[in-house]
Amino acid sequence: MSAGLSELQRSVLRILCDTFVPSIKVSDDPTGFWARAASELGVDEVLGKDLIERVPPPLRDGFLALLDNLAAQGFIEASQDRRERILKDISSSSPEAAGGMLFYEKQTLLLTYGLPMQPEPNPTVVTYGAPKGQNPNWEVLGYPGPISIPEAKPKQIKTITPEGDNMTLDADVCIVGSGAGGGVIAAKLAMQGHRVVVLEMGNQYNSSDFHQLEIWSYQNLWYRGGATLTANGTVNLLSGSTLGGGTEINWMNCIRTPDLIRADWVKRFGLEGVDSPQYDRYMDTVEERLSVGSETAYFNAHNLRMREGCQRLSYQTSQTRINWDPNRFNPLMAGYTGLGDQSGAKQTVRRTFLLDAYRHGAKIMVHCRADRILVEQGCAAGVEAAYSDPQGRTAKVTIRAPQVVVACGSLESPALLLRTGIGGPAVGKYLRVQPGGAVYGVYEEKQRGWWGSPMTANCTEFVDTGDGYGFYMEIPAFAPGFYASVIPWSSGKVHKEIMTKVPYIATFIWFLRDKGHGEVTIDKSGNAVHTYQLSDETDQKNFRHATATAMRIHEAAGAREILFAMSNRLISWKRNQSESLEAFIERISKEPLLDGAQPIISAHQLCTCRMGNDPQTSVADTTGELRDVKGVWIGDASACPTSLGANPMITIMALASRTGDRIAQRLGGRIAMPNTPPPSYHSVEAMPRMPTANVFEMIPQLATNMFREMFGLITNPMNMFTLGNRILSGLSAGGQRCERCGMTGQPGAGSYCMSCGHSMVR
């Protein structure tokens, strides 16, 4: 244990972890699951080390004070029941105490079910990255853990590092952030011959680094090490922080900007051209570069349960289009995509646009946090940043550039502007998080939610409930540690009972197009502070509607039990109980929503530096450029004027491509779509559209593609399974057929296609 904790604090921490995950004697315990306490896995050791090395000093002092408080109440000597009562009493004493206890609870559960262990002879030593590491709790959950050792491969992008304490570079444009927006702009400008420098706060990883271990992934790929709670304790924020940004960890649902949103942005915010064919071409180009398609979007058990339930209720569904390379697709690895894709099938920004930028001369630096934007005479002059790597090397980095793109993501972009003191009164003011929740269905047969492609069947029945707002329902891919941490803890015994049900659980999640908004500010040290409250009446109505809808779909799909999480307890409905499901839903609808009463998750943060035509309510003008500082551009999800009600990756990229053209004009370049390498076509839908006059020139290519697909079916039996699934999916898809993209299972009349955004009219 770290020397930063006293002996008494170490003892209290060990007992605290064992209170959350206790040793319980039962008559039948063949795997030792019930008898195994958290400390037997070394959880208290890891948590204590994290407290000292990872938690900022002000928070750390508060967490350690809680340990002292527990010691003063006789926590070490108390029985399990007494300790549980002490924890509940402390949590109810103040919001600060509740937040501290929640930290210990969530971290203990995450580590107990997520940590791998070294093999014998020293089973108490825990490592984050042991390639062959296993966790003894995984056996009862049916979780395989890591299934393959990654192949050693060199990184395709060679990043630059400072050679001394100070480093200065000259560039035409400095891009802060390497995610969906920053990567697209970097490629567009570098491929036109401009000098591009990209700064990324996180590190670079590739498939060689991905060992399919969730704790390692959260700490290295995710923003602030995993689910980050807002400052007011209401929303868990999920975001990427690595080279490639959120595209490295997302679940790949590629949805085009809905027509409804595009029209609204033009009418209310003045974003000229967003409703035009030119914007369609922006989306077409990024989809082509990402190999977006539905070839590998088949249904695992969770997705089948949603589709079955929706069909029985006559709810509209759609099949996801995802950015997989079909030639590399492996369903055994697909469920680990949120932990970093080992197979190389996932077409992330790192593997596509950033690689294009690098091959055209862009310089990319990781471990580099932008402190402020340099401004001279009202114009951008560059970026001042701090380099700090895991080896302890630090340096001051200055990029001199007349154009600066802020693309740090909606959680960090406003913080950079606030640290610089630019952007106007709306900076950080309109944080949309597309708030979401989850309902768990327990089925008779095992569901194995970590196997196969996540998020392939979606319920689109309520994307627009009449006023342009509603909710979208889909399927996640959770690993055991995350499951354990999001299931509320009421007692050690109850939580273990619920965890034994995990193999049989299918999880339905949803997110809203939110009307209400939160805010991003900075603290005294300049760090981003996020607040959000689900206080808007429309948002509350839609959140409750989504909860009820998920329960009805589970019931229709055959779930024997439905579990709904409040922040401090789990509420259950069973099929054989006297209370009807509708009565249960009515009872749940009276539960509070505000102040963290129900767990809310956000994977999509937007609008904190939004574009628009009103200087009081927007940060950038309608082209993406700041009004008060020329040459500073917004190039990420924070530029969106409103919430989308759809997964935002394609929209972020299309808007970034639009903004990139404006920057190219400023630099004296041309407006042109990126010259992407020709993709490998695997379906008629993906074939390039050619003029009728050239139809005979297509025949040799058509024959080549037909042979390639048939050869793939012969040499890889899994491709045959995928093809069969595609055929069955097409036969069973209900609802409308989109005239633009041909996808079936679409929303009802008057709505829009959730695949390509086209307006749907019967």
Predicted regions and their residues:
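Glycine-rich loop(s) and the adjacent beta-strand/alpha-helix scaffold that form part
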Residues: 184, 188-214, 236, 242, ...
